[in-house]
Structures are given as structure tokens and as C-alpha cells.
């Protein structure tokens, strides 16, 4: 839809989280349809474009869901093919500029990235160009957890914090040190997207998080490290989930 906000998952390797969210949404729709029988909860075209839990079983397999974000098939909501760090930052500027040129400046472009994605040179050009073009419809959402895949924290090689990374380029800044608090995240996102912006400049919302939270393996060690099936950590993470949501494995 022309008025729908755009999502660029610049941190494209995190796309399994999008898949999981869409699968949960599909389950919720199925449950409402079964309980109430209201066709409003049925997906059009027989669910041709829906992403279900069954699709998760083929993640990163031939013909299954790709491991990086792709604007295709069941993930057309993602407005760029992304994967490498920072890859989606320049096109997010292009998307915001195109929307403004089309008279749709009220449509926001949300780009999600981690601080590691700010290290490529193109990210600096992106931040400067977004301000220079006055892209008030561009909102960056930054996951600030101080780790990528390396043993050394990002802060050991990159100086500063989100404010010092974006304020010199003229951006509006908001954020929270409680990046795992839903109310705090919501507040920061709404402030970035809907807050007063008299200078009509791009906005940043940052979230301080802990990489690996709730997984039992933290920081860079959590990256691409699935727990062995039926191991102690495998069941520890599931027990916490079962206790909170009342489900059983």
C-alpha cells in the first residue's frame, strides 16, 4: 500500500527474527479464525503470502527461507536485499528520498542496524546525505550491544556512543538504556517517528541491549551458536520460555 511505512532490515543477517515474528502472527490469526470463524482473520489467496511455523523448518535450506533478508516471496515487506554489515543504509536513504519526491513524505522508512554496521565508509555518507537532503521521514533504529562476531568489544576499536555517532551529522537523537523493555523501546520509537522535528531532519532511536539475552551464551559467543539438541542449555532456555508462556515441548 502506498501509505504503508517501509522497513529496511539493514542488519539483514538477523532476518530469522522477522521470520519468527511473522510465524507467531500467522499462528495468532489461525487461532482467532478457528475460535471466531470471522473471515477477517483469514489470509487472502489461501495464505499464499503468509509465513508459517512450517516454513521455519526449511531455514537456510535449498528452496527454503534464506539466511539473509530478501525482498521476495513471503518477505516482500522488507524493502531491500540485505546481509553484510551496513548494506541497507544507503538504500534506506534512497527509499526515503523517492517517497518524498512522490509526495509521500508522511510514509516513514525505518532502518534497523547494529553499531557494527556503522563502521563501513558508506554509513558516514548515508548519515551526511540523509541530513543534507532533509529526510525527516527516515528513522534509524540502532541495536547497541557492543559486540559483533569478534572477541573484542566494538567499543575497544570504535570510540563513542550513539549520540556522538549521529549528532555531528545533525540527526535527532532519542534512545533508552533499557533496550529489552517493551515500554521503553516503544517510547523511543514513537519519539523518533512522531516527536517534534522542527528542523525536518532524520531521526535515530538507539537501544542498549545485551547480545544473547535469555539464551545463556552472551556477547560474540552467542553469534551463530545453536545449543546442541537436548543439551543442558538447550533445555534451560526452553524451561524459561515454557514457564512464562505456559507451553510445553
Predicted regions and their residues:
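Cofactor-binding active-site loop characterized by glycine-rich and histidine/acidic residues
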Residues: 1-133
Amino acid at each position: 500500500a502506498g501509505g504503508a511505512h517501509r522497513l529496511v532490515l539493514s542488519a539483514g543477517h538477523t532476518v530469522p527474527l522477522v521470520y519468527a515474528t511473522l510465524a507467531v502472527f500467522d499462528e495468532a490469526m489461525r487461532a482467532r479464525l478457528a475460535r471466531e470463524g470471522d473471515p477477517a482473520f483469514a489470509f487472502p489467496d489461501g495464505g499464499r503470502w503468509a509465513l508459517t511455523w512450517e516454513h521455519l523448518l526449511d531455514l537456510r535450506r535449498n528452496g527454503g527461507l534464506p539466511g539473509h533478508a530478501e525482498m521476495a516471496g513471503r518477505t516482500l515487506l522488507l524493502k531491500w536485499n540485505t546481509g553484510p554489515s551496513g548494506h541497507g543504509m544507503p538504500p534506506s536513504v534512497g527509499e526515503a528520498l523517492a517517497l518524498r519526491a512522490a509526495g509521500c513524505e508522511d510514509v516513514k522508512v525505518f532502518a534497523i542496524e547494529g553499531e557494527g554496521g556503522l563502521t563501513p565508509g558508506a554509513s558516514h555518507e548515508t548519515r551526511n546525505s540523509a541530513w543534507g537532503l532533509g529526510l525527516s521521514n527516515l528513522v534509524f533504529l540502532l541495536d547497541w550491544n557492543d559486540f559483533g562476531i569478534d572477541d573484542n568489544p566494538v567499543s575497544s576499536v570504535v570510540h563513542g556512543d550513539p549520540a556522538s555517532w549521529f549528532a555531528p551529522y545533525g540527526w535527532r537523537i532519542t534512545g533508552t538504556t533499557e533496550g529489552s523493555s517493551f515500554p521503553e523501546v516503544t517510547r523511543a520509537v514513537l519519539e523518533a517517528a512522531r516527536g517534534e522535528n522542527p528542523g525536518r531532519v532524520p531521526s535515530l532511536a538507539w537501544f542498549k541491549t545485551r547480545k544473547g539475552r535469555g539464551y545463556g551464551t552472551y556477547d560474540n559467543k552467542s553469534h551463530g551458536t545453536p545449543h546442541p539438541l537436548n543439551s543442558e542449555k538447550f533445555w534451560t532456555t526452553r524451561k524459561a520460555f515454557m514457564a512464562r508462556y505456559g507451553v510445553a515441548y
